[in-house]
Amino acid sequence: MLVIILGIIGLLASSNLVSSSTSTRVGGHLPLTFDPPENELGYWCTYVESCRFCWDCEDGICTSRVWGNNSTSIVENDYVKYCEVSRWGNLCRYDVEEHIYHSMNCSDPKPWNPYKIARKEWKKNEHPRKDLKKDEF
């Protein structure tokens, strides 16, 4: 009986570490959250990049929290969505604000971005930061 219990514990423990193609390790269970751990942002934002927790937005302009100033800034619009993420074993799940769900195998993740058409890169000449208002886009 003890051998069976130890075997089950071993199986559960081994399923708690999964690797992503970003060479980041995420493991264990993550209860539903709007704010995933900082060390997991690279993982979560690689596969659904429109989640609000992936962006620092100020005055209508958003910069990536993962890639920072080395990435293109975007205009804050319908592309940036409130998302909750969770992980149970090897199942990673995104819950997007319109009650849209995306689930994937954590160790075999697939990018998902149905909002890509709404993404608008920020260009200084087109949208000066000081004049940009949310109702302009």
Curated annotation (Swiss-Prot):
It comes from the Viruses. InterPro entries: ASFV_fam_110 (IPR004848). Keywords: Glycoprotein, Signal. This is Protein MGF 110-7L. Glycans are attached at residues 69-70, 105. It comes from African swine fever virus (isolate Warthog/Namibia/Wart80/1980) (ASFV). It holds the Pfam family v110. Plays a role in virus cell tropism, and may be required for efficient virus replication in macrophages.
